[in-house]
């Protein structure tokens, strides 16, 4: 089973880098490390999580799931004010410095943008907008006033991976409607399904059949028979709570963080599938991977099909598609994020140059 959230991805990748061998899967029994390697692993995990992971933590974890559970508490900590996470603060001596605003991916937090931040100019401020409930439009309606409070009339640099890209796009529309200066919008593999996702009762049944197979593989549990009639009476929130409660009742020990990740992942992906995309009169950059990962396609087969414009061409007046290769799940980490960072740095430098020229005039 591959990593399921940011903590498991960081832990999995760190194990592979330090030992030179893939752990295989998150449930695979980890080989015993010597003390030097365990210390090196602990140091690297501590740097990524920004919290104290010890060699003892590494040596006593039987698999990646167990080690990631220790990493998660630190990785998801940090400075948060309401729903805004400070990834790098704007320098006090330069309040005019234009920050990058990033938006959380489906089922995750904005800590996933650390590798991107490390690929941008060293003094680039970055603020992450964390999860609020509701449709895409309802979430953007909460984010836009906060963006204006932080950045006034602009310019605005907005970016996001996965759902984060859809949220960045919705906020760009909200800001433009209020006459604000949106300088740049970047979608990191926020690629729409290549075919329409039907919203019918029959589709609800098919979706939950697929989810049951996905959950059995991901959690290593047996899902009891799904009571479709009961599910059909519930909204998306009620449906996922119902199914996850059944998973919990199975008696298998699953970290609370993973259960919450599954709940928010499901709701966030449903928000994408049911969003009504509005036209945008401006420039948007889409960093496009080759494909979605197998789990995403297993859950919604229509994501196996990708349009050359990622499904955005009919809405965006000036769309730039930048191919980055790889799978969706890899797009936010090294080495692929280096391509995004290099292109984005160029775009940021051009914006700063234009701004300096205008101020000079």
Locate the predicted segments by residue.
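Phosphopantetheinylated carrier protein domains
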Residues: 19-27, 34-62
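Short acidic-aromatic active-site loops that bind/stabilize oxyanions
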Residues: 1-5, 31, 133-137
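A generic structural signal for short
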Residues: 3, 30-31, 105, 160
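A short, structure-level motif marking secondary-structure boundaries and short turns
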Residues: 26-29, 156
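Thiotemplate assembly-line natural product biosynthesis machinery
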Residues: 1-23, 37-44, 145, 286
């Amino acid at each position: 089973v591959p990593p399921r959230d940011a903590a498991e991805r960081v832990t999995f990748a760190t194990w592979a880098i330090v030992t030179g061998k893939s752990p295989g899967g998150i449930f695979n029994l980890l080989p015993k490390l010597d003390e030097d390697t365990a210390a090196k692993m602990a140091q690297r995990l501590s740097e990524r999580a920004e919290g104290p992971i010890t060699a003892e933590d590494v040596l006593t974890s039987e698999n990646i799931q167990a080690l990631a559970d220790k990493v998660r508490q630190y990785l998801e900590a940090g400075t948060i004010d309401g729903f805004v996470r400070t990834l790098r603060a704007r320098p006090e001596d330069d309040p005019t410095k234009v920050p990058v605003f990033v938006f959380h991916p489906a089922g995750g937090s904005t800590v996933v943008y650390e590798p991107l931040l490390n690929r941008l100019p060293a003094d680039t401020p970055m603020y992450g907008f964390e999860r609020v409930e509701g449709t895409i439009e309802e979430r953007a309606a909460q984010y836009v006033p906060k963006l204006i409070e932080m950045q006034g009339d602009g310019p605005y640099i907005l970016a996001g991976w996965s759902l984060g890209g859809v949220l960045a796009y919705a906020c760009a529309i909200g800001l433009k409607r209020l006459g604000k200066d949106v300088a740049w919008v970047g979608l990191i593999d926020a690629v729409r399904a290549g075919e329409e996702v039907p919203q019918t009762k029959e589709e609800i049944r098919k979706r939950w059949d697929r989810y049951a197979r996905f959950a059995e593989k991901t959690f290593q549990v047996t899902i009891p028979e799904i009571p479709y009639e009961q599910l059909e009476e519930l909204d998306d929130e009620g449906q996922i709570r119902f199914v996850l409660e059944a998973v919990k009742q199975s008696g298998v020990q699953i970290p609370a963080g993973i259960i919450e990740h599954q709940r928010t992942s499901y709701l966030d992906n449903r928000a994408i599938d049911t969003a009504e995309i509005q036209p945008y009169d401006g420039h948007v950059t889409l960093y496009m991977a080759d494909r979605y990962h197998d789990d995403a396609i297993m859950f919604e087969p229509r994501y196996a099909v990708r349009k050359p414009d990622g499904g955005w061409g009919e809405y965006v007046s000036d769309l730039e598609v930048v191919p980055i290769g790889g799978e969706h799940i890899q797009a936010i980490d090294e080495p692929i994020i280096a391509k995004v960072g290099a292109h984005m740095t160029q775009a940021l430098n051009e914006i700063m140059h234009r701004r300096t020229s205008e101020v000079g005039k």
